[in-house]
């Protein structure tokens, strides 16, 4: 109660005292390394359908840059909408062991997963972020969706809380000094859950070194002789039958979805399939995969018949 009275008293005194205080700039960017991003996605996928969380290691380079170089998972149990608080004993032991392996970076924030329901902060997440910002005012909360994330597009966002005193005094939570911090269109779920009122979104970028680019290009790369291997005909026939059955099921799902879209309003269509499987995309991918496998097996069979 006393803190609320002091806050109201400061608001009545005017905004002149708040004018000289440093404000967060909207061009502030969070740079996440490839290693940290892969670890977050893998941790989130393994925990599906439950939420998982972990801590991010890095440094605050300047007033506009937060660099995340690595992450590690926390042994927290989660539900469908929240995760528990951080275990300080595990965090201290993990930080000590990481320093011995040449990882002296500090904790710059935390991450957790929202499997299938978008990137936003719940009330429990806001309380967790408040505890982080009490220790480090510039701490960042990263939310990743491992279900909606696909190859080439990661559903991820970074947030930080808005000081309630700035809202009471009618001030903007961030100042604008450049056009670097362009505003990404927020999702409806994030706006409903307090984006722009209780917390704001930070820009995310990914910096890759030459070695990291080589590592990512070779991540799922097959050797040159892999395409010349001739698969067993029985196993290839079984795969083709399974692929055809899957394509039949996906085509039925897509037909049913198209028929249902006629009866839905535009507002219902906007949120009807959020976090659900898109049968059309999966059908295209399955057809392309089946064609590629059959073409490569036919070419390998022809080469083997000519060579041997």
From Swiss-Prot:
Zn(2+) binds at residues 112, 114, 125. It comes from the Eukaryota. Keywords: Hydrolase, Metal-binding, Metalloprotease, Protease, Proteasome, Zinc. One of its GO terms (cellular component) is proteasome complex. GO terms for molecular function: metal ion binding; metal-dependent deubiquitinase activity; proteasome binding. GO terms for biological process: proteasome-mediated ubiquitin-dependent protein catabolic process. A motif (JAMM motif) lies at residues 112-125. Signal peptide: none annotated. Residues 30-165 form the MPN domain. Pfam families: JAB, RPN11_C. Acts as a regulatory subunit of the 26 proteasome which is involved in the ATP-dependent degradation of ubiquitinated proteins. The 26S proteasome is composed of a core protease, known as the 20S proteasome, capped at one or both ends by the 19S regulatory complex (RC). The RC is composed of at least 18 different subunits in two subcomplexes, the base and the lid, which form the portions proximal and distal to the 20S proteolytic core, respectively. Belongs to the peptidase M67A family. This is 26S proteasome regulatory subunit rpn11. It comes from Schizosaccharomyces pombe (strain 972 / ATCC 24843) (Fission yeast). The lineage of its organism: Eukaryota, Fungi, Dikarya, Ascomycota, Taphrinomycotina. The gene is rpn11.
């Amino acid at each position: 109660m006393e803190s609320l009275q002091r806050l109201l008293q400061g608001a009545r005194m005017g905004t002149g005292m708040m004018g000289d205080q440093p404000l967060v700039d909207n061009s502030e960017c969070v740079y996440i390394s490839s290693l940290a991003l892969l670890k977050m996605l893998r941790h989130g996928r393994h925990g599906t359908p439950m939420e998982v969380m972990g801590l991010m290691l890095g440094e605050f380079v300047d007033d506009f840059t937060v660099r995340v170089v690595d992450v590690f998972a926390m042994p927290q149990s989660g539900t469908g909408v929240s995760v528990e608080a951080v275990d300080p004993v595990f965090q201290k032991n993990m930080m000590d062991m990481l320093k011995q392996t040449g990882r002296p970076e500090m904790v710059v924030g935390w991450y957790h997963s929202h499997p299938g329901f978008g990137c936003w902060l719940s009330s429990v997440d806001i309380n967790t972020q408040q505890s982080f910002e009490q220790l480090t005012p510039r701490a960042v909360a990263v939310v990743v969706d491992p279900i909606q994330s696909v190859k080439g597009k990661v559903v991820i966002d970074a947030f930080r809380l808005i000081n309630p005193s700035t809202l009471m005094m009618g001030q903007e939570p961030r100042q604008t000094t450049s056009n670097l911090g362009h505003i990404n269109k927020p999702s409806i779920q994030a706006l409903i859950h307090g984006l722009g009122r209780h917390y704001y979104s930070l820009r995310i970028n990914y910096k890759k070194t030459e070695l990291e680019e080589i590592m990512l290009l070779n991540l799922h790369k097959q050797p040159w002789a892999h395409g010349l291997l001739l698969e067993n005909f029985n196993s290839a026939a079984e795969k083709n039958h399974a692929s055809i059955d899957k394509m039949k099921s996906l085509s039925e799902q897509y037909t049913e979805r198209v028929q249902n879209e006629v009866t839905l309003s535009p507002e219902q269509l906007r949120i009807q399939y959020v976090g659900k499987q898109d049968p059309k995309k999966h059908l295209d991918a399955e057809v392309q995969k089946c064609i590629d496998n059959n073409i490569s097996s036919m070419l390998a069979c022809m080469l083997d018949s000519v060579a041997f």
